[in-house]
Amino acid sequence: MLRIADKTFDSHLFTGTGKFASSQLMVEAIRASGSQLVTLAMKRVDLRQHNDAILEPLIAAGVTLLPNTSGAKTAEEAIFAAHLAREALGTNWLKLEIHPDARWLLPDPIETLKAAETLVQQGFVVLPYCGADPVLCKRLEEVGCAAVMPLGAPIGSNQGLETRAMLEIIIQQATVPVVVDAGIGVPSHAAQALEMGADAVLVNTAIAVADDPVNMAKAFRLAVEAGLLARQSGPGSRSHFAHATSPLAGFLEASA
């Protein structure tokens, strides 16, 4: 069971809504993933009506919506988008995204921290997308963010956990949930994130652009479950030396 702020989730896999070939395929994949928290870019939906092609099926699916501020380049733009989302969707939950460079889509740490502090004070449950910077993640936690969402690699790159060393530090020091966001390309990446201690992963591109998004969503669901179970089972420690699983010494001595 995963708890973030006032909500609990059985699934440790969060999903996105972008890049799917159709809204129907998007919903089928989300259902197959078992995800209970789904991100939604405000720039992609018509907030004036709940029968929007993306919004309506998500509401019908009964998932928790996590509007994001993707497209915002400054703290001010993100705060403005956050208030639009709260008014339209009736939720205080927000994935804070500020990335001024359209080529790399890397989060702006200064603007993100600035916006996070303001939004928390205004009553939002803030989940910030950020670089895998342990110092920044701690600062975001200190200003009241409900979770932190450090990247594994650039958005949509499918490179996996390129920031693993920094993610391990973030996980070790965090007192709020850590959700690895961006760059996860195959189910094994998700399993590794859960094994190393992440509380959840957010996956969008890897599912949406797969030849079979529904089955890929199932694969991610199973990978996250496997990674979590492996961590909870207490894996053995690593060693530089070999350790025989079936020592022969006693057997040979007895047979001499």
Curated annotation (Swiss-Prot):
Residue positions binding 1-deoxy-D-xylulose 5-phosphate: G156, A182, G183, N204, T205
Record protein name field: Thiazole synthase
Keyword Transferase set for record: yes
Subunit record text: Homotetramer. Forms heterodimers with either ThiH or ThiS.
Key words of the record: Cytoplasm, Schiff base, Thiamine biosynthesis, Transferase
One Pfam short name: ThiG
Organism per entry: Escherichia coli O8 (strain IAI1)
The protein's enzyme class: transferase
The protein's Enzyme Commission number: 2.8.1.10
Entries under SUPFAM superfamilies matching the protein: ThiG-like
